[in-house]
A protein has these predicted regions:
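Hydrophobic micro-packing sites on short alpha-helices
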Residues: 30, 59-67, 74-75
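Residue-level recognition of specific faces of alpha-helices
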Residues: 44-47, 73, 87
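A short, Lys/Arg-rich alpha-helix, primarily the initiator
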Residues: 1-22
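Interfacial/linker helices and their anchor residues that mediate assembly or domain coupling
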Residues: 79-107
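Short alpha-helical DNA-recognition segment
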Residues: 23-47
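Short, basic-rich loop-to-helix N-cap that marks the start of a DNA-contacting helix
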Residues: 24, 42-43, 50-65, 81
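DNA major-groove recognition helix of helix-turn-helix
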Residues: 34, 49, 59, 75-78
C-alpha cells in the first residue's frame, strides 16, 4: 500500500529517509545494520521509504536504534513535534529534566 498524505506508512517513509540520509547511510547499510539479510536489505529499505511496505513495530524499533532516533520519531505526524522528540532524545539528561520541568510548570 503506497503511503501518501497522512498515512502512518507515509509518515514512516519520510522520517526513515530523513534520518538515514542525515547519518549518510545507504539503504543497504541501514538494512544490514538493522538485521536484514544483505541480499534483501537495500530492496526492503527502499520499499519502506517508498511506502510500498511499512515496517512492523519490531523492525521499526531496530531501525530507530540504528538511526539513533526514538521510535516515536518514525510515527510522528507533525514535523514540529518530530523535531521536538528528536531534540529531547539527543539532549543531555540534565537539559531533558529542565525542559520537562519548564513544560510541566506551564501546564
Amino acid at each position: 500500500m503506497a503511503g501518501t498524505g497522512n498515512s502512518t506508512a507515509g509518515i514512516q517513509q519520510k522520517r526513515l529517509k530523513e534520518a538515514r540520509l542525515q547519518l549518510g547511510l545507504s539503504q543497504k547499510q541501514l538494512g544490514i545494520a538493522a538485521g536484514l539479510d544483505e541480499f534483501v536489505a537495500s530492496t526492503r529499505i527502499n520499499r519502506y521509504e517508498l511506502g510500498i511496505h511499512a515496517p512492523d513495530y519490531p523492525m521499526a524499533t531496530r531501525l530507530a536504534v540504528v538511526l539513533n532516533v526514538p521510535v516515536a520519531f518514525l510515527y510522528c505526524d507533525s514535523d514540529e513535534m518530530a523535531q521536538m522528540i528528536l531534540a529531547f532524545h539527543r539532549a543531555p539528561k540534565t537539559r531533558r529534566r529542565q525542559a520537562m520541568a519548564a513544560l510541566q510548570s506551564q501546564g
